[in-house]
Amino acid sequence: ITPRLDTHGEVNLILTNGSHLTAEWGIDVKVGDTFTVYAQSTDEGTMGRLTACLPADFNLDRMVHYSVWPDSGMAGIGSSARWRAGNDGIRESEGTIIINGGNIRAKGQDNASAIGGTRAEEIEFRSTDRGKIYNRRQGGSITINGGVVRTEPFALPEGNPLAVISVGIGTCHYGYGGSVTINGGTVIA
């Protein structure tokens, strides 16, 4: 078990007035899953809050053992990269995220969206007798109907010459397809 919240099927989260849920390692929403957020009210001063802001470093030395290890490139809310026993890895296609209300703050890691998915072209790589097969990673659907949504892409310390490939909302670099629809609310990305 990992500290990352993992959705299975349809998950509805209702943020009651004055509540604050912090998902320190984010919320995983992979293909086939739908994560919908509601708020009890529309008053910014009282509506519930959801924070899914990932740390820049998170036990990279793997001193704590997990059966399914979240890897770098995790979205604050969305799909991620995971490694199972040894070096067997998978980068997930994205699911469906619907935000109807609430005060939402999200930040992904380097190579991931704050709300969306991981940076990768293929889900997994394997070789066969006939050559290489790539299973293309698909973008998901993100709809914002209300609430206050604040995202920030991962940023390296000032002066670091490395490029950062992250976005606030949407499919991250190399993902195929996907959509972002904003029907209402306040969005700062």
Mark where each language-model region is.
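A composition-driven surface/loop motif
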Residues: I1-A189
